[in-house]
A protein has these predicted regions:
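N-terminal beta1-alpha1 cap of cysteine-dependent amidohydrolase-like domains
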Residues: 1-133
Length: 134
């Protein structure tokens, strides 16, 4: 039985050898550094345990990607994965589709937008399964 440390006892699990599970790469959330907290002196990349638990319960093997601008790394992520999951997060910057109206930049994450736009392009190129949430 595979689960995360935060899995509750009522979370369904699939008894499958991890080597036989489809590899689902998960795009992380981006959290800026908080210089006043010693444990977050640099930015963090993370995924929610509930997202990991859901992939495990569905029979997948979740693995977190790292955010990068390197298209070759992104392409390799997609090539080795059986599927890609992108969890919800901040708003996508409206400027990406030509909306020039004022918008609160604290509601967006340009680092994540840039990575995820490249990632989705590569997923579509490779015709791999893609699961996203809002």
């Amino acid at each position: 039985m595979i689960g995360t440390r935060t899995s509750s006892s009522d979370t369904p699990h699939v008894d499958v050898d991890p080597a036989d599970r489809p590899l689902i790469l998960v795009a992380p959330r981006w959290e800026e550094a908080k210089p006043f907290l010693s444990e977050t002196l640099s930015p963090n990349e993370e995924i929610a345990s509930v997202f990991v638990d859901a992939i495990l319960a569905a029979g997948g093997l979740p693995l977190q990607m790292s955010i990068t601008e390197d298209i070759e790394v992104i392409r390799h992520y997609v090539d080795i994965a059986d599927g890609i999951a992108i969890p919800g997060g901040p708003d996508v910057n409206p400027k990406r589709w030509g909306d020039d109206r004022p918008y609160d930049p604290t509601l967006c994450c340009e680092i994540r937008d840039s990575f995820e736009f490249k990632l989705v392009g590569e997923v579509l190129r490779a015709k791999k399964p893609l699961f996203t949430t809002c």
